[in-house]
Amino acid sequence: MYGADLPADQQLEFSHRYILGVYDLYDRLTKAFPDVLFESCASGGGRFDLGMMYYAPQAWCSDDTDAVERIKIQDGTSYGYTPSMWGAHVSAVPNDQVGRLTSIDMRAKVAYFGAFGYELDVTELSDEEQATIKQQVAFYKQYRKLFQFGTFYRLETPDTSDNVYGWETVSHDKQTAIGMRYQILNGANPAYIRYYFKGLDPERRYTVNDGSEVFSGAELMNAGYFVPRVMNRLQSPKVPSDFHADMFIVKAVD
């Protein structure tokens, strides 16, 4: 990149001047249209920064929309920015970037953590998938504020747990939390799985996924929640495959 109007000894100013020009344009746009939410694009182009967030408080994380890739991308983004800033969508499969096939359930459970949406041709989906999308949209609308503005926790990464990422968001009053456990690759006869929550009220009692069993917050954080898992097809034909996500909705009962 270079500036045709700049002399040779000022060419290093070009990129800086360009960004100042972008800020100036955004300033005029946001003043002219104060009720419009602008989204900047994209972190792959180095435009996911605090200066851009001043004008466009939502950014497209990456053109890489594969669910597995997006777990890593959004996990890294979480170190600097809150989920309300992440543009996160369910896209078509096979994925355009990596050709991977993931379930619409997995894709949605990754995209829930962020400014949720879809970028695919719904007319190419089966009736079952279209019905699933309606359910996903209704679910996200119910918990949108929690996903975008709750307290976000990173619970597991491949550095601490094989092939696994774990995220959680907790409401500020600690009444509700949603945890997600992403299994990238499955393995034979996995060990017993416990999901350890964070940020709950240790004195309160909670249910998980509207179950009948009641747990204290201290128990869920220190002893963990047992995740039922089919070990092999002799137990059930529904063995979790690769690219699987478990979701835990936690609600206070007192």
For the regions a language model picked out, list residue spans one by one.
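Aromatic- and acidic-residue-enriched carbohydrate-binding clefts of CAZyme catalytic domains
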Residues: 1-23
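A glycine-rich phosphate-binding loop feature that marks nucleotide/adenosyl-phosphate handling sites
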Residues: 40-49, 126-130, 153-161
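Catalytic cores of secreted or luminal carbohydrate-active enzymes
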Residues: 105-156
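Carbohydrate-binding surface patches
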Residues: 158-202
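Solvent-exposed beta-hairpin/edge-strand motifs
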Residues: 198-213
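C-terminal beta-strand-rich structural cap/linker in extracellular carbohydrate-active enzymes
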Residues: 217-254
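Glycan-recognition surfaces
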Residues: 16-123
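Hydrophobic, well-ordered secondary-structure elements that form the walls
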Residues: 38, 111, 179, 208, ...
